[in-house]
């Protein structure tokens, strides 16, 4: 989309760069902010990115990959990645004249921001943080995607817990079908 409403939607500094946000991504962010606004612009970026990834068929936003290799994770152009870096860096308070590069920090700033994202707090929040590592979240899900993943995991674990006996003549039957090799 070349033009987006200004309501909490981060805009690239360069007009030559356009974000890949869909109207649904933007509506998701507006919905979240209409129910509980956040003053942290990284929260807005995370909400947009989670929705964007869901639209691409991914169940979650992997915060480690976002930090270490955003181009691979998002499949964006170099210009879009640079705009994301610039937007993210300008979103965080800093004392120095030039904003820090969040992608070169020693601790994942995306995970730190997600940790206090208001839309991922509580049992019925619209987003879920998962897979804690060193006290920081590793993934951000839309709640429905997280619930679907949990349901699949439970079903697989139930199947794995089921024990059944293998008939004694199974090896014989397999040899008859496939030979000794």
What residues fall within each predicted segment?
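Helicase P-loop NTPase motor core of nucleic-acid translocases
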Residues: 1-181
């Amino acid at each position: 989309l070349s033009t987006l409403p200004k309501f909490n939607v981060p805009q690239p500094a360069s007009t030559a760069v356009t974000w890949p946000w869909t109207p649904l991504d933007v509506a998701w962010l507006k919905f979240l902010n209409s129910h509980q606004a956040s003053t942290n612009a990284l929260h807005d970026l995370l909400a947009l990115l989670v929705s964007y990834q869901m639209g691409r068929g991914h169940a979650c936003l992997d915060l480690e990959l976002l930090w270490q290799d955003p181009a691979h994770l998002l499949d964006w152009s170099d210009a879009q990645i640079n705009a994301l870096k610039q937007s993210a860096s300008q979103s965080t308070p800093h004392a120095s004249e030039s904003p820090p590069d969040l992608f070169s920090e020693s601790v994942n700033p995306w995970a730190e921001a997600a940790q206090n994202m208001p839309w991922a707090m509580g049992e019925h929040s619209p987003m879920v943080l998962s897979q804690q590592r060193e006290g920081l979240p590793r993934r951000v899900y839309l709640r429905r995607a997280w619930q679907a993943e949990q349901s699949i995991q439970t079903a697989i674990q139930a199947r794995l817990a089921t024990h059944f006996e293998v008939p004694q003549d199974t090896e014989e039957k397999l040899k008859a079908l496939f030979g000794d090799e």
